[in-house]
Amino acid sequence: MTQPIVVAALYKFVTLEDYVALREPLLQAMVDNGIKGTLLIAEEGINGTVSGSREGIDGLMAWLKTDPRMVDIDHKESYCDDQPFYRTKVKLKKEIVTLGVEGVDPNKKVGTYVEPQDWNALISDPEVLLIDTRNDYEVSIGTFEGAIDPKTTSFREFPDYIKANFDPAKHKKVAMFCTGGIRCEKASSYMLSEGFDEVYHLKGGILKYLEEVPQEETKWQGDCFVFDNRVTVRHDLSEGDYDQCHACRTPVSVEDRASEHYVAGISCPHCWDKLPEKTRRSAIDRQKQIELAKARNMPHPIGFNYKQTPSEA
């Protein structure tokens, strides 16, 4: 029986002054262990989602933990039958998750971590303001009961949203969450810098919550968007039924795919009447390349305008 592919989402905010020099040995460790996916490294830490065999993931994690700064690196695992990534990359970045606000550093100031088993009690408190820090297309397919959707299209928009809608003098308790924990951790550092006093964030993110909290006790509704070919996972972390429109990145449901406006790789009901002609032509060309690669049984990066984006985890 074929062993499932292990998908590991990992990150750690830690000062890596030598991050440029780390790139090549880290890339070699990924190659040596047969790992696919992308890792981002910056002076503020490391972030990414990778996949491989059980032995490969264990080998990579063991290599990372030989560095004393990485001994307690956070990672979550799920499984799938097919390789969700096609390439092996290590990228140098200014930020491992891009907020775009100078001086925000979770290594120096961060909110209160909340374990998954304590999350339900916290968000049941009527005085707690619950904010989903993810992008609008992620929120559309699943979120926590009672969560506020900022309707942002990128994490860079989050600071302006907070400034326009919330006041530290009025909103005393704030709880935030994201896919794997990294965005809400950085958001908590930003919120504290803006004067918010009680700031909480879900440790390990939604993925850790789904892993540890039984479905009969859950306050999660829907699927969870993930940044790989699986597109979404269910509460049991199995692959969901969504695909992703390669033109606009929006998750598309079974119902969406039945629409006359859905053309695989080219358009969906969410974008068919909004796509610029140049984008549409590029999507058509990319889809032809994908189909040709499939016919030749060769891997090909997923469609137009889609990027593996571990920085959004």
UniProtKB/Swiss-Prot annotation:
Keywords, in A-Z order: Oxidoreductase, tRNA processing
SMART domains for the chain: RHOD
Enzyme class: oxidoreductase
A Pfam short name: Rhodanese
Keyword Oxidoreductase set for record: yes
Molecular function as annotated in GO: oxidoreductase activity, acting on paired donors, with incorporation or reduction of molecular oxygen
Catalytic activity of the protein: uridine(34) in tRNA + AH2 + O2 = 5-hydroxyuridine(34) in tRNA + A + H2O
UniProt family annotation: Belongs to the TrhO family.
Functional description taken from the UniProt entry: Catalyzes oxygen-dependent 5-hydroxyuridine (ho5U) modification at position 34 in tRNAs.
Protein name: tRNA uridine(34) hydroxylase
